[in-house]
Curated annotation (Swiss-Prot):
Residues 1-20 form the signal peptide. Ca(2+) binds at N118, Q169, D178, H212. This is Alpha-amylase-related protein. It comes from Drosophila auraria (Fruit fly). Gene3D superfamilies: Glycosidases (3.20.20.80), Golgi alpha-mannosidase II (2.60.40.1180). The modification Pyrrolidone carboxylic acid is found at Q21. It is found in: Secreted. The keyword RNA-binding does not apply. Disulfide bonds join C48-C104, C157-C171, C376-C382, C418-C441, C448-C460. Its cofactor is Ca(2+); chloride. GO terms for biological process: carbohydrate metabolic process. The record marks D310 as: Transition state stabilizer. It catalyses: Endohydrolysis of (1->4)-alpha-D-glucosidic linkages in polysaccharides containing three or more (1->4)-alpha-linked D-glucose units.
Amino acid sequence: MIKFALALTLCLAGASLSLAQHNPQWWGNRNTIVHLFEWKWADIAEECEDFLAPRGFAGVQVSPVNENIISPGRPWWERYQPISYKLTTRSGNEEEFADMVRRCNDVGIRIYVDVLLNHMSGDFDGVAVGTAGTEAEPSKKSFPGVPYSAQDFHPSCEITDWNDRYQVQNCELVGLKDLNQHSDYVRSKLIEFLDHLIELGVAGFRVDAAKHMASEDLEYIYDNLSNLNIEHGFPHNARAFIFQEVIDHGHETVSREEYNGLGAVTEFRFSEEIGRAFRGNNALKWLQSWGTGWGFLDSDQALTFVDNHDNQRDQGSVLNYKSPKQYKMATAFHLAYPYGISRVMSSFAFDDHDTPPPQDAQENIISPEFGEDGGCLNGWICEHRWRQIYAMVGFKNAVRDTELSEWWDNGDNQIAFCRGNKGFLAINNNLYDLSQELNTCLPAGEYCDVISGSLIDGACTGKSVRVNERGYGYIHIGADEFDGVLALHVDAKV
């Protein structure tokens, strides 16, 4: 009986930890993460204070913080090839990182670190040098900066059969040296690395290549992490938010369901299907059942996105900044529909898969510059600074915890819906105008369309809609309009 009680206690404790790892630890009603891909720590600190906090963003996903290999031309993916766990990269050093985390936390912006637990750097001829000056010999699996040696890795093999679980979780992903997470020593080094980041005040982690690690090994690592640092405003006994990269298109040998009990999972099907819909390959009317009705994970388990730093570079259905009208429509739907833990992308311009972030002649990452409209210049795209996107972050905050209601569609690619009595969204992806009297569910009054303009000193710089006593308003979105979206909410009442 005592053994049973102990087993039950341990089981409940484990379940409690796993549930806690689904909590992003947001402030107030904020509920959108932005991925500031390849930004420098000092620039992120300023962005938290000057832009993200005033506009209601909840958190920032940052690029990997650990020392990485220096690759010719400095492609973005060198950040995903660790040399050591020293916190020195082209984004800055440990002091700059710690300063950024503190400053962002002080204004209610949480920091989530992209972490590499699966592997170290891939093959390199001779001695490789990292961004902190540490030497390593990847071909010999020698990483003195940790230190790791050959005994800490799985035997070398290629993934040639993606239906073979052993290969997927033990062989080398694109030649990257595959760590043995079942080893007590490797586990201890990974926990030490993550705990150091927790001590510095981060709120959680995006776990790269999670499907290439056994879920039971990850569970051990997560369960043995420290609680979040209360000196950064986290409650006592709060756990790190975990979201895991698991690419699962369905019928995979390693499935997302093996990981969703440990934390959230990146819902790649969301990205693919929303791209198909707004590219015109699936009628928007079908989005009424969006979410689990499409075979997606439960809402609180799904990290959702239109595109990410990987798939935005691939050919296919996924939308990116190069299709701005469709991208903004898809993002508006993403942030308005009550499904998932939302993340928006902030990119730099790229011409090919390997394009590095904007850099100077000495290969130092350069800071973004801003135009008069607040948008980014000098090679940075900064989708999060597009009015149509940051306005929808405000919309999502305004309608938090409300239900979707009053769905309307024209049987094709014009849709509209309410979020309780706090928000209304309409989208026109047809080649003809949307002109319709629709129920906005809002209290009577005049509302600023936050897509076409902003509410400044009580006046709307874009379109506005007058809502009558029954909650109805005349909605017009021309086929040739710049954005194809109209959004109203209670915090944008004129």
